[in-house]
């Protein structure tokens, strides 16, 4: 039977249904239990917010049937038998957190609910079969408490989603023996993941769609998805992709992250992937993003925006020299700017528009 454990409180299905939620002061617990209560009462439509990292947050209203299809797709892929122990440490007003709760309710899991924080395993001591993390959480676990991965059972799985996985994090994950760790691809509109790639063990370069998920590219090379979670209605994403003969695909970047600099189209994510390796080589541990800033000569000038204080002059010189090794001369930033703190959404995604 599905159970939610939060700090020292235990709630089973019957208790959740009977709860007077006005008596619960903890906002995260109350919101999570309210969602569970509505689901257990048989609601046919669920309200879900998008994170707003790529624009104004919006609300969608998926059906119960579509949400159950998402649970079934994941259950088939991960071969869940029911009764698993899972850690729920994501914001439950967004789709990733809601889907964790729904999998638990539908499959009779024991769910350890935890207010989202940077290292969910820091003080955690229970055995686990499944967890979903954002990349920042996974990185903190591996850097600060790698021994906590021993809490995961032999057949356990971890999924990572919500933001891109850096080259540095991917390298760390590749050396983890157990549990199996996957990166997911999906969005609010597809009711969490519709494709998956393995990051350790027999790792994969590309995402593989889950069963019954159909993909194609439109004329702009944007990925179009049809799946049980969309009730087989096609969703046109903003993600520029490549699809391969084996049915797998790779995301190159977002259509709205292409700039036109002096007549040359540049996909910002491709530049960032190369610059990230340069940061690693010179031992620079800072967050950064590439943006196109308006310019009379270039139209949009490729600009590297680094989080934090201005770098010492010798470090910035070293960085500029390293740029000469980039695979494409158009990938060399024309300008470096600094921002004390990047603006983030509630789910920890950086708002690129705020960098301009």
Predicted features along the sequence, with ranges:
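Conserved ATP-dependent adenylate/AMP-binding module captured primarily in the ANL superfamily
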Residues: 1-26, 68-87, 117-129
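Conserved AMP-binding A3 loop
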Residues: 45-72, 79
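AMP-binding/adenylate-forming
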Residues: 62-69, 85-140
């Amino acid at each position: 039977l599905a159970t939610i454990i939060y700090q020292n409180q235990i709630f089973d299905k019957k208790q959740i249904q009977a709860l007077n939620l006005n008596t619960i002061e903890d906002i995260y617990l109350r919101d999570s239990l309210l969602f569970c209560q509505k689901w257990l009462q048989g609601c046919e439509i669920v309200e879900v917010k998008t994170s707003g990292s790529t624009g104004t947050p919006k609300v969608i209203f998926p059906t119960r049937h579509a949400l159950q299809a998402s649970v079934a797709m994941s259950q088939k892929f991960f071969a869940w038998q029911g009764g698993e122990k899972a850690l729920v440490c994501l914001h439950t007003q967004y789709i990733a957190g809601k889907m964790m709760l729904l999998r638990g309710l539908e499959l009779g899991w024991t769910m350890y609910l935890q207010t989202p924080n940077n290292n969910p395993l820091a003080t955690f001591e229970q055995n686990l079969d499944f967890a979903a993390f954002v990349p920042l959480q996974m990185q903190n676990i591996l850097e600060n408490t790698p021994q906590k991965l021993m809490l995961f059972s032999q057949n356990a799985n971890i999924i990572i989603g919500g933001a891109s996985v850096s080259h540095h994090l991917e390298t760390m994950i590749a050396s983890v023996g157990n549990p199996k760790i996957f990166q997911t691809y999906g969005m609010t509109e597809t009711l969490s993941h519709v494709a998956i790639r393995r990051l350790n063990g027999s790792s994969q370069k590309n995402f593989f769609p889950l069963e019954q998920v159909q993909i194609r590219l439109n004329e702009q090379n944007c990925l179009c998805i049809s799946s049980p979670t969309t009730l087989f209605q096609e969703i046109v994403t903003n993600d520029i992709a490549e699809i391969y003969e084996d049915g797998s695909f790779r995301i190159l970047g977002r259509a709205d992250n292409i700039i036109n600099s002096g007549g040359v189209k540049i996909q910002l994510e491709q530049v960032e992937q190369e610059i990230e390796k340069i940061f690693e080589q010179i031992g620079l541990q800072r967050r950064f993003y590439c943006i196109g800033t308006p310019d009379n000569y270039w139209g949009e000038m490729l600009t590297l925006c680094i989080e934090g204080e201005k770098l010492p002059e010798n470090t910035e010189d070293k960085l500029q020299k390293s740029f000469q090794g980039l695979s494409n001369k158009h990938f060399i930033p024309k300008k470096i700017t600094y921002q004390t703190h990047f603006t983030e959404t509630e789910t920890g995604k950086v708002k690129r528009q705020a960098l301009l």
